[in-house]
Amino acid sequence: MSDAFSSETALVLFSGGQDSTTCLAWALSRFARVETLGFDYGQRHAVELACRDRLFDGLKGLRADWADKLGESHTLSIPTLAAISDTALTRDVAIAMGADGLPNTFVPGRNLVFLTFAAALAYRRGITHIVGGMCETDYSGYPDCRDETVRAMQAALSLGMARKFELHTPLMWIDKAATWKLAHDLGGEGLVDLIREQSHTCYLGERGAQHEWGYGCGECPACSLRAKGWNEYVAHR
């Protein structure tokens, strides 16, 4: 555990996916107490939210100290985000690239909204550390996943709420293969297996097809990234 955070509480943005589960384990290995926040925004893959309880149980079973540290689980419903978005994550349309070079899975402002609500909740609960799974390395070009966006949000939220927030993004500079390795470093094969079997990444919400790397359609960008990362991780472990 880092001595710098050994007495602190963190709030983790926890969707039930691979990245956020890895970030949750990362936080549990560093902070004295960890709370989580998930969002129901009308996403097609809302099945990810149902995965969280199984992941909580699995994490508690992996390490007794993690069980002691896991605090309150929060869920916020923000259907307005889907109402104002015309994307493949919130509409039953095919996934494709847009004219602007971004995939139509991009939900404009999603991470900005998530971080704002997270900071508001953290403020009320006396928490200054917020952990998110944003990543610049293996991402689809989403502008709200960039490090400069996260740093700008940290400054804006700290100014706007007169509270010195620190936004932690442990996956920002690593790819999916390294994310699998990080999970192993944090919790061994037990955590890797838990993420494979219980987390959800597929944009289409497919839980009927199981692969070596987990459940999903196997075709969408999220599944492709997860599978590619898994294959590279397995090849080098």
From Swiss-Prot:
Name by which UniProt lists this protein: 7-cyano-7-deazaguanine synthase
E.C. numbers: 6.3.4.20
Binding site for ATP: F14, S15, G16, G17, Q18, D19, S20, T21, T22, C23, L24
InterPro entries: QueC, Rossmann-like_a/b/a_fold
Biological processes per GO annotation: queuosine biosynthetic process
Function summary: Catalyzes the ATP-dependent conversion of 7-carboxy-7-deazaguanine (CDG) to 7-cyano-7-deazaguanine (preQ(0)).
Cofactor binding summary note: Binds 1 zinc ion per subunit.
Assigned protein family: Belongs to the QueC family.
Pfam families attached to this UniProt entry: QueC (PF06508)
Pathway(s) the chain acts in: Purine metabolism; 7-cyano-7-deazaguanine biosynthesis
SUPFAM superfamilies: Adenine nucleotide alpha hydrolases-like
Binding site for Zn(2+): C202, C217, C220, C223
Cofactors: Zn(2+)
UniProt keyword terms in alphabetical order: ATP-binding, Ligase, Metal-binding, Nucleotide-binding, Queuosine biosynthesis, Zinc
Catalytic activity, as annotated: 7-carboxy-7-deazaguanine + NH4(+) + ATP = 7-cyano-7-deazaguanine + ADP + phosphate + H2O + H(+)
